[in-house]
């Protein structure tokens, strides 16, 4: 007669807990304390952020700025303001006492323009690498030092593999840059989290050939960055600002197409003034009027009974000359919208229903989404621009 196969019974009750405690002790011995932990054991602080220097973008990001220890991708067409957004973040990090690094793979950083945006160029670490491998190796070493608060790589498209640089014109190097990015991001992600460094990758757009439906636009460097990025921002120039016949800047729209730290698909619109960068005061005025903090009567802007100026430009200049007032109005905006340090905690949340209407073009991010399968009432009708 064949012998019956017996299996060892799983430990029960206290025995299971003892077995788990023994396993955890062994793991901590081999890999260090904190290698495994219960999620509820540690009172984790809110996600730390680096302000973008732009009130509208801080609000769209949902947490008051770029998350620390995460990867951020900023992409868009040429001359849309991508580098300007990154330089403003560097300026804010430096103002808070942080150390910033800029990997200038495009060899196009303008120190004079950076200074006008508030960047301390004397303290800014800059590298102009020869190859993509060198750029990413330098970035990885800086992150692992634990001393860098913000790292900007400009741009992914300019991270040219060594084999391509040393090869002949016309040689095929299919997928080489994508493999390079995938390997680098696998190495850097954990180091970024441990060091609290924010890494901003600036990327360019390309067009896929033969696309019949949906957007033909895609970003360079393969798909790895799309997966590893906690935040992806699409930056577009939507309008030229003029003073009479002279162009003085651009109206820019930034759409948060991916956000792992807050609800995505929010949109921020702001002004970029030539030679000055993003106008923080202009964003404050727009948001304050929208939220009833600043009153607009005709062309006059009024705050708590005091006139800020006639016309938006004069009100903007007044706030620029009185930064304390601008800070006060900005704080009231953040408080009203519950952004950053004013975000509601679990104890403050209510059961009142909240209606969200995402500003999203469904052709932009997820081509496999089928709206017909969504529950009734999931979406409201939105009007998109041509």
UniProtKB/Swiss-Prot annotation:
UniProt keywords, alphabetically: ATP-binding, Cytoplasm, DNA damage, DNA recombination, DNA repair, DNA-binding, Nucleotide-binding, SOS response
Gene3D superfamilies (UniProt xref): P-loop containing nucleotide triphosphate hydrolases
Span list, region Disordered: 362-386
Binding site for ATP: 76-83
Subcellular location: Cytoplasm
GO molecular function: ATP binding; ATP hydrolysis activity; ATP-dependent DNA damage sensor activity; damaged DNA binding; single-stranded DNA binding
Biological process per Gene Ontology, one example term: SOS response
CDD domains in alphabetical order: RecA
InterPro entries noted in UniProt: AAA+_ATPase (IPR003593), DNA_recomb/repair_RecA (IPR013765), DNA_recomb/repair_RecA_CS (IPR020584), P-loop_NTPase (IPR027417), RecA-like_C (IPR049261), RecA-like_N (IPR049428), RecA_ATP-bd (IPR020588), RecA_C_sf (IPR023400)
UniProt xrefs under PANTHER family: MITOCHONDRIAL DNA REPAIR PROTEIN RECA HOMOLOG-RELATED, RECA
Family to which the UniProt record says this protein belongs: Belongs to the RecA family.
Cross-referenced HAMAP family: RecA (MF_00268)
Protein's UniProt name: Protein RecA
Source species: Corynebacterium efficiens (strain DSM 44549 / YS-314 / AJ 12310 / JCM 11189 / NBRC 100395)
């Amino acid at each position: 007669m064949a012998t019956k196969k017996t299996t060892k019974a799983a430990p029960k009750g206290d025995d299971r807990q003892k077995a788990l405690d023994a396993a955890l002790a062994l793991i901590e011995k081999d890999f260090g304390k904190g290698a495994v932990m219960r999620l509820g054991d540690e009172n984790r602080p809110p996600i730390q952020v680096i302000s973008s220097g732009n009130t509208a973008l801080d609000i769209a990001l949902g947490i008051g700025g770029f998350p620390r220890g995460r990867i951020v991708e900023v992409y868009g067409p040429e001359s849309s303001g991508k580098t300007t957004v990154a330089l403003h973040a560097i300026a804010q990090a430096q103002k808070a006492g942080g150390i910033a690094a800029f990997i200038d793979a495009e060899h196009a950083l303008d120190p004079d323009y950076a200074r006008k945006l508030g960047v301390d160029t004397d303290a800014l670490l800059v590298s102009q690498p020869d190859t993509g491998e060198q750029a990413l190796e330098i970035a990885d070493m800086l992150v692992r030092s634990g001393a860098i608060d913000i790292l900007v790589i400009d741009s992914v498209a300019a991270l040219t593999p060594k084999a391509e640089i040393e090869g002949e014109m016309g040689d095929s190097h299919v997928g080489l840059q994508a493999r390079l990015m995938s390997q680098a991001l696998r190495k850097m992600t954990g180091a970024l989290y441990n060091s609290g460094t924010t890494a901003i990758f600036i990327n360019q757009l390309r067009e896929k050939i033969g696309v019949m439906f949906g957007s033909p636009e895609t970003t360079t460097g393969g798909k790895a960055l799309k997966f590893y990025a906690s935040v992806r921002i699409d930056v577009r120039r939507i309008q030229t600002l003029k003073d009479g016949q002279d162009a003085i800047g651009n109206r820019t729209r930034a759409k948060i197409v991916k956000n792992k730290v807050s609800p995505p698909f929010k949109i921020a619109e702001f002004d970029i003034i030539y030679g000055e960068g993003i106008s923080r005061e202009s964003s404050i005025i727009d948001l304050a009027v929208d939220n009833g903090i600043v009153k607009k009567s005709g062309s006059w802007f009024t705050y708590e009974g005091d006139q800020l100026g006639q016309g938006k430009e004069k009100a903007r200049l007044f706030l620029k000359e009185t930064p304390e007032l601008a800070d006060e109005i900005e704080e009231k905006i953040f408080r009203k919208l519950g952004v950053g340090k004013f975000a509601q905690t679990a104890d403050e949340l209510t059961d009142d229903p909240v209606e969200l209407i995402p500003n999203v073009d469904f052709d932009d991010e997820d081509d496999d989404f089928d709206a017909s399968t969504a529950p009734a009432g999931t979406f409201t009708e939105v009007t998109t621009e041509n």
